[in-house]
Amino acid sequence: MLRRIIKYTFLGLLGIVLGWIIFELITFPNISQLRDHNPETTSMIEARLREAQERGDQPKRIQTWVPLEKISVNLQRAVLAGEDTNFTSHHGFDYEAIQKAWEEAQREAAKEAKEEGDDQSSWIPAMPSFKRGASTISQQLAKNLFLSSEKSFFRKGREAVITYFLERKLSKRRILEIYLNVIEWGDGIYGAEAASQYYFKKSASELSAREAAFLSAIIPNPNTVFNPQKNPKRVARRQRIIMRGMPYVKIP
């Protein structure tokens, strides 16, 4: 009896795994086409449009695609300093480096908040929570392009697989180019060019180091936590931290 239970349990688990593999093969996105074709939309953009409709608001999408050569090196450095300092050397996953960098950021931000008399040093998530959510640029792009915000084992597994193939199929420059053109920089603002025009009335190619660090500072959550209108001190503190790291990051 016990042997039969073990047998059927094993077959059941095997069936689930095989079913998941078949589903992945059928629904897996075509990563290779991103080498030469810019994505027309992303899962995140579509989710934001649906959210606006559900609220009864007019959906907004302001986005202008520009090649990486027309995005300021300052912004490239700032984004890597803020989001993924080892982007050029890792293969999609770099949790240890992110943890070390964020621990240092926590210490510096808390110190500066105290000096400014702002008792909001807890604006940076506690390390255990942050570590679970930390992502490299490649991981962020995988989620942004193809996945929902659902938190589940299968979604994280799919994110890991897509990240692996993004790194295998695309160059680092192409990954960074797509990332900088699709990420959200405010309500309905997508991509570096739209963000530059919205915040500074200039092209993304003309951004100064300080302006670039400002845009990088709001990436984690431009609508609430790092909204420059609602939380200017938080944005300014993160901006300063990013500016300190910009000279040391390597761009692809």
Locations of the language-model features?
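Juxtamembrane regions of bacterial inner-membrane/periplasmic proteins
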Residues: 2-252
